[in-house]
Swiss-Prot record:
GO terms for molecular function: auxin binding; zinc ion binding. Pfam families: Auxin_BP. It comes from Zea mays (Maize). Glycans are attached at N136. Its main location: endoplasmic reticulum. This is Auxin-binding protein 5. Gene3D superfamilies: Jelly Rolls. Homodimer. GO terms for cellular component: endoplasmic reticulum lumen. PANTHER family: AUXIN-BINDING PROTEIN 1.
Length: 150
């Protein structure tokens, strides 16, 4: 997922899901360096040029069937303009309908699901549209457009 950070720099964790099948997504959070505050973290920084994803800290944020890895990020790696996330959603998972004050771009690495997008840029503004997503596809969400993935 590619996502521009809000001006506050307080990026929310994206939530993606799949019902009846698993979904593996790569996420990227992009931001203008000028809008980011200097972040302090108790996390040890890993400034290695090459990192082994299988050794990176993984969290589920208390959600069964969900896995999140920050591949590179501001707190753990000191990046200023981009964060990259790798997330896995198990069968039966679904996000709430939500929106962000930033753009997002998703890359589906494995599995399939459905994107529900309520966008003012669609043919029928205000009418949510269901769009199938599957392995090797990408999709982007405009700023503030409500969306849900399952």
């Amino acid at each position: 997922m590619v996502r521009r950070r809000p001006a506050t720099g307080a990026a929310q964790r994206p939530q993606l899901a799949a019902v009846g099948r698993g979904l593996l997504l790569a996420s990227v959070l992009a931001a203008a360096a000028s809008s980011l505050p200097v972040a302090e973290s108790s996390c040890p920084r890993d400034n290695s040029l090459v990192r082994d994803i299988s050794r990176m800290q993984q969290s589920n944020y208390g959600r069964e069937g969900f896995s999140h890895i920050t591949v590179t990020g501001a707190l753990a790696h000191g990046t200023k303009e981009v964060e990259v996330w790798l997330q896995t959603f198990g069968p039966g998972q679904r996000t709430p309908i939500h929106r962000h004050s930033c753009e997002e771009v998703f890359i589906v690495l494995k599995g399939k699901g459905t994107l529900l997008l309520g966008s003012s840029s669609l043919k029928y503004p205000g009418q949510p549209q269901e769009v199938p997503v599957f392995q090797n596809t990408t999709f982007s969400i405009p700023v503030n457009d409500p969306h849900q993935v399952w």
